[in-house]
């Protein structure tokens, strides 16, 4: 994956790998939000925005780390299995690959869209093969804001994946975005407690069907 090397440091990749081995939940007020179906989600209040950062840990059975990472990176395929995607594509901008992503929101809320860059690295850490994908929002004039769609200008995500020692994957995900506008608290709570686990389950199903897509 061609990424914006300038946007992500080696330290950011190392931090994601370290979280996979030992979750960094001390020294801050991380709260356990939900634990179900092998997925555990913690949240931390981001004081400036009043929103939450999230950390997700879990095991996804029946999907190898390499396959899971390939599916996660395949934006064209995601349009087939992610029901919330309205538009998703990637193109070159200022000598780096930039992704555009519009997300469907329930009526009467406006859809949100993201402009972001991402980078994948397949790392060997203490004889462990770890796949890491980092993503963050950027400003790119080639992607002007659309009428009726709210641009998410603060978005950051980390994903680290390794084998669970069987046929599945151990996963760590960090996630934060500021969706802007007035989002009902029930929708924010639903997205955190149900949206993330459901997304991971859908991604496992997508892995199982990945070889059939062509």
Curated annotation (Swiss-Prot):
Tissue expression per record: Abundant in liver of pups but levels in liver decrease 10-fold about 2 weeks after birth. In adult, highly expressed in epididymis, testis, kidney and bone-marrow derived mast cells.
Alphabetical list of PROSITE patterns matching this protein: START
Keyword Cell inner membrane: no
Subcellular location: Cytoplasm
GO MF entries: phosphatidylcholine binding; phosphatidylcholine transporter activity
Lineage top rank: taxon: Eukaryota
Post-translational modification Phosphoserine, affected residues: 139
Modified-residue entries (N-acetylmethionine), positions: 1
Record keywords, A-Z: Acetylation, Cytoplasm, Lipid transport, Lipid-binding, Phosphoprotein, Transport
The keyword Cytoplasm is assigned to this record: yes
SUPFAM superfamilies recorded: Bet v1-like (SSF55961)
Sites where the protein binds a 1,2-diacyl-sn-glycero-3-phosphocholine: 72, 78, 157
Gene Ontology terms: biological process: cholesterol metabolic process; negative regulation of cold-induced thermogenesis; phospholipid transport
Matches recorded under InterPro entries: START-like_dom_sf, START_lipid-bd_dom, START_lipid_transfer
GO cellular component, one term: cytosol
PANTHER family membership: PHOSPHATIDYLCHOLINE TRANSFER PROTEIN
Summary of the function given for this chain in its UniProt record: Catalyzes the transfer of phosphatidylcholine between membranes. Binds a single lipid molecule.
Quaternary structure (record): Interacts with ACOT13/THEM2.
Protein name in UniProt: Phosphatidylcholine transfer protein
Species in which this protein is naturally found: Mus musculus (Mouse)
Name of the gene this protein is made from: Pctp
């Amino acid at each position: 994956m061609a990424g914006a090397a300038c946007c992500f440091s080696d330290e950011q990749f190392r931090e994601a790998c370290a979280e996979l081995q030992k979750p960094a939940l001390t020294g801050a007020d991380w709260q356990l939000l939900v634990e179900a179906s092998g997925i555990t989600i913690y949240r931390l209040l981001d004081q400036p925005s009043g929103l939450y950062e999230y950390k997700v840990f879990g095991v996804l059975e029946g999907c190898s780390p390499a396959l899971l990472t390939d599916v996660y990176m395949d934006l064209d395929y995601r349009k087939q299995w992610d029901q919330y995607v309205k538009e998703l594509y990637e193109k070159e901008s200022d000598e780096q690959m930039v992704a555009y992503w519009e997300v469907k929101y329930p009526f009467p809320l406006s859809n949100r869209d993201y402009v972001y860059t991402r980078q994948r690295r397949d790392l060997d850490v203490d004889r462990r093969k770890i796949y890491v994908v980092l993503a963050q929002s950027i400003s790119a004039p080639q992607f002007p804001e659309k009428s009726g769609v709210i641009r998410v200008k603060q978005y950051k995500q980390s994903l680290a994946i390794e084998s669970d020692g069987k046929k599945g994957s151990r996963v760590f995900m960090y996630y934060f975005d500021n969706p802007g506008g007035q989002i009902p608290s029930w929708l924010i709570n639903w997205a955190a407690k149900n949206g993330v686990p459901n997304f991971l389950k859908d991604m496992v199903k997508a892995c199982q069907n990945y070889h059939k897509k062509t």
